[in-house]
Amino acid sequence: VQKDFPASVREIILSGCQGHCGSRPFYSKEEKKLAADAMEKMQITPLAKRCYRTLSGGQQQRVLLARALCATRKMLLLDEPVSGLDPKVTAEMYALIQKLNYEDGITVVMISHDLNAALQYASHILHIGDTVFFGSKAAYLNEFPQVWQKGGTAQ
């Protein structure tokens, strides 16, 4: 979404349903409910009529996550979803993403350079560096014990 795009939060979120619409020019009641539910999950319902470009970075991330929820109900692929956010908003976003995974059963595949967060929230780690690793957190820490010693960075 371009930052200058003059769409409301609700319109941006509804655009996630376009893959379900086919050639219909309007959204169905079910799609509108799906968007409303996604706004509720992301705790942004009061922002529904606001212009996307006037939102803070954290609010914009929540809008885009709500839009993604309208597009899929099974898996989210997130690329650095907390990039540029302050620590408080980062913690809130990770908590929302974790809730989607635990309570809604949505598989979350997330690209992150924040190894501490990955180790806190992920069930499995794919590490691509000088060596490649895929496995559980426990197996990762056995393979890379220096992670905790270096404050969450593995070489």
Outline where the language-model segments fall.
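Conserved ABC ATPase "signature" region
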Residues: 14, 29-47
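Helix N-cap at the start of a conserved alpha-helix in ABC-type nucleotide-binding domains
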Residues: 87-89
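H-loop/switch region of ABC-family ATPase nucleotide-binding domains
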Residues: 112-113
